[in-house]
Each structure stands twice: as C-alpha cells, then as structure tokens.
From Swiss-Prot:
Component of the large ribosomal subunit (LSU). Mature yeast ribosomes consist of a small (40S) and a large (60S) subunit. The 40S small subunit contains 1 molecule of ribosomal RNA (18S rRNA) and at least 33 different proteins. The large 60S subunit contains 3 rRNA molecules (25S, 5.8S and 5S rRNA) and at least 46 different proteins. The gene is rpl3703. GO terms for biological process: cytoplasmic translation. InterPro entries: Ribosomal_eL37 (IPR001569), Ribosomal_eL37/eL43 (IPR011331), Ribosomal_eL37_CS (IPR018267), Ribosomal_zn-bd (IPR011332). A zinc finger (C4-type) spans 19-37. This is Large ribosomal subunit protein eL37A. One of its GO terms (cellular component) is cytosolic large ribosomal subunit. It comes from Schizosaccharomyces pombe (strain 972 / ATCC 24843).
Length: 89
C-alpha cells in the first residue's frame, strides 16, 4: 500500500465531532478543543486573517432583538416614561 491518496480511503475514525457551542463538526475529540470557535476557551476564536469568517458570526447576523430597538430610542434622545402634559395638550 502506498502512503498517499489511496490510504486516505482506509480511514474510519472521526477526529472531530459536533461542538456544543457553535454546532459545527469541528470539536477535536483528543485535543478537546473546537477548531471553529475555540471552545472550551471563554473567548470565541477569531483572527484578523479570517475576515470572512468574522463577518459570518459577528453582531448583526442574528435576530438582534434588542439592538433593533436602540436606533429608535437614539432618535428620541433615549427619553423614557410618559410624555409631559404640555405635549398631550
């Protein structure tokens, strides 16, 4: 048997499994670290050379249920509470 392409077909064991943080099949079983998000590290793995990867998982790619409302509050000067009586009259 040669040591190149032919021998890759003989492989059966999985080196990576599903990561519980990012959900990708990037969690290395023996190292017990995720190649995608860096789990179990506290901070998410991200590098400047991976600008495209950053774009995929940065703020604005999800629901942003709170941040969507911030723009409207900013327009009104972050005023809270009921309007004054002068405004209603």
């Amino acid at each position: 048997m040669t040591k190149g392409t032919q021998s890759f077909g003989m492989r059966h064991n999985k080196s990576h499994t599903i990561c519980r943080r990012c959900g990708k099949r990037s969690f290395h079983i023996q190292k017990s670290t995720c190649a995608c998000c860096g789990y179990p590290a506290a901070k998410t793995r991200s590098y400047n050379w991976g600008a495209k990867a950053k774009r995929r998982r940065t703020t604005g790619t999800g629901r942003m249920s709170y941040l969507k409302k911030v723009h409207r509050s900013f327009k009104n000067g972050f005023r809270a509470g009921k309007p004054t009586s002068a405004a209603t009259a």
